[in-house]
UniProtKB/Swiss-Prot annotation:
Annotated protein name in UniProt: Venom protein family 1 protein 2
Organism: Platymeris rhadamanthus
Family: Belongs to the insect vpf1 family.
Domain of life assignment: Eukaryota
Gene Ontology terms: cellular component: extracellular region
Keywords assigned: Disulfide bond, Secreted, Signal
Taxonomic classification: Eukaryota, Metazoa, Ecdysozoa, Arthropoda, Hexapoda
Keyword Disulfide bond tagged: yes
Expression tissues: Expressed by the venom gland (posterior main gland) (at protein level).
Length: 152
């Protein structure tokens, strides 16, 4: 009798895992999506904060409208470049996430399986965050140099 109960328990467990195993993958994907969007937004804020701090500091030194216009132009270029950096590093995964999200909303789980096969998110996150930090650190002196030329 005990063996029959144990075997029934095992069969029921495997059935539950089979039924809800995909559900765990879906929940994990939504957590990855949430984290990827957070990382993208956080990186955007960090790099733009650096630019705005540099602009604010140099704007005090501007004496006429030509210098202020030059500073504004440098700021605009830096913001465009910073967004390209963010999209090229921590934001590379977002188009794939959007595609899978849309597929899951319609009930198609095939894109999720392809996403899981193509992306190792923890590894990607570490690698691209380090890459982002390097590129953001390289952008700051370039922006500062251009801003200094505006008020020279």
């Amino acid at each position: 009798m005990a063996k029959l109960v144990f075997i029934s328990f095992l069969v029921a467990s495997f059935c539950l895992i089979g039924c809800f195993g995909g559900e765990a993958e879906i929940k994990q994907f939504w957590l990855v999506r949430k984290n990827a969007i957070f990382q993208f937004r956080f990186a955007t804020v960090e790099i733009e904060k650096t630019i705005y701090q540099k602009v604010k500091h140099i704007l005090v030194k501007a004496k006429d409208d030509d210098q202020k216009n030059c500073i504004d132009g440098v700021k605009s270029e830096a913001i465009i470049e910073s967004r390209a950096i963010v999209k090229g590093t921590v934001g590379k995964i977002l188009p794939a996430i959007d595609e899978v999200s849309e597929a899951l909303r319609t009930g198609d789980e095939n894109k999720l399986k392809a996403f899981n096969n193509n992306w190792n998110y923890p590894e990607y996150k570490v690698k691209e965050l380090a890459n982002f930090k390097l590129k953001a650190a390289a952008l700051a002196p370039t922006v500062q140099e251009k801003l200094d030329k505006c008020v020279a």
